[in-house]
């Protein structure tokens, strides 16, 4: 069975987080990984360069030197290790898994809130508090989506759960009940 990036990412992320905690470098590593993610988002071809046989070893070494130049030893070692084991393309998944573990350690939950109109600052703060309490976390990182088709109410998506209190959802449930045998 082939091991996918999604399978190895949590292992690398957990090991990196533990090493960062041991060296009191969690914040530094987190910031560097966010910067790396931006580089990969802006230049996605970087992720495939190390697998490309047409690119010389010297060019690959030069790229690795550039990527690790300002990196902490932990992040530099992660880059070199993933390249060495042919997992460089897994870095976005590893960064995502690290971010999840980091948020979990910090007591932060990521949630997407969909409403028909933009939330006021007070409404957003109230939702953050409610979501954090509901999931037993300290705070909520809120991503707000405005979708007029929900008509009213709020849909919250967090940790694979959906809490749908929208008017559209209620209408859909009523319609299904009316059409049921």
Swiss-Prot record:
Nucleus listed as a keyword: no
Q: Which GO terms describe its molecular function?
A: proton-transporting ATP synthase activity, rotational mechanism
Keyword set for this entry? Answer: ATP synthesis, Cell membrane, CF(1), Hydrogen ion transport, Ion transport, Membrane, Transport
Its cellular-component GO annotations read: plasma membrane; proton-transporting ATP synthase complex
Q: Matching Pfam families, A to Z?
A: OSCP
Instruction: Please give the InterPro entries that the UniProt record associates with this protein.
Output: ATP_synth_OSCP/delta_N_sf, ATPase_OSCP/dsu
Please give the coiled-coil regions recorded for this protein.
none
Membrane topology type: Peripheral membrane protein
Instruction: Look up keyword Electron transport and say if it applies.
Output: no
Subcellular compartments: Cell membrane
Question: Which family, according to the similarity comment?
Answer: Belongs to the ATPase delta chain family.
Fill in the subunit field for this protein: F-type ATPases have 2 components, F(1) - the catalytic core - and F(0) - the membrane proton channel. F(1) has five subunits: alpha(3), beta(3), gamma(1), delta(1), epsilon(1). F(0) has three main subunits: a(1), b(2) and c(10-14). The alpha and beta chains form an alternating ring which encloses part of the gamma chain. F(1) is attached to F(0) by a central stalk formed by the gamma and epsilon chains, while a peripheral stalk is formed by the delta and b chains.
Function in brief: F(1)F(0) ATP synthase produces ATP from ADP in the presence of a proton or sodium gradient. F-type ATPases consist of two structural domains, F(1) containing the extramembraneous catalytic core and F(0) containing the membrane proton channel, linked together by a central stalk and a peripheral stalk. During catalysis, ATP synthesis in the catalytic domain of F(1) is coupled via a rotary mechanism of the central stalk subunits to proton translocation. This protein is part of the stalk that links CF(0) to CF(1). It either transmits conformational changes from CF(0) to CF(1) or is implicated in proton conduction.
- What is the protein's name according to its record? ATP synthase subunit delta
From the UniProt record, report the name of the gene that encodes this protein: atpH
């Amino acid at each position: 069975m082939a091991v996918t990036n999604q399978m190895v990412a949590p292992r690398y992320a957990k090991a990196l987080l533990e090493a960062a905690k041991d060296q009191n470098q969690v914040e530094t590593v987190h910031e560097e990984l966010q910067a790396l993610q931006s580089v990969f988002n802006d230049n996605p071809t970087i992720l495939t360069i190390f697998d490309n046989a047409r690119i010389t070893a010297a060019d690959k070494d030069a790229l690795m030197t550039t990527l690790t130049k300002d990196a902490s030893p932990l992040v530099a070692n992660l880059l070199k290790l993933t390249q060495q084991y042919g997992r460089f393309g897994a870095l976005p998944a590893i960064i995502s898994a690290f971010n999840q573990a980091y948020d979990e350690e910090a007591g932060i939950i990521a949630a997407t809130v969909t409403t028909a109109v933009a939330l006021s600052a007070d409404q957003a703060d109230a939702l953050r508090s409610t979501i954090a309490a509901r999931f037993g976390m300290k705070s909520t990182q809120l991503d707000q989506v405005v979708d007029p088709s929900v008509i009213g109410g709020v849909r919250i998506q967090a940790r694979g759960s959906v809490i749908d209190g929208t008017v559209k959802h209620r209408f859909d449930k009523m319609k299904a009940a009316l059409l049921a045998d």
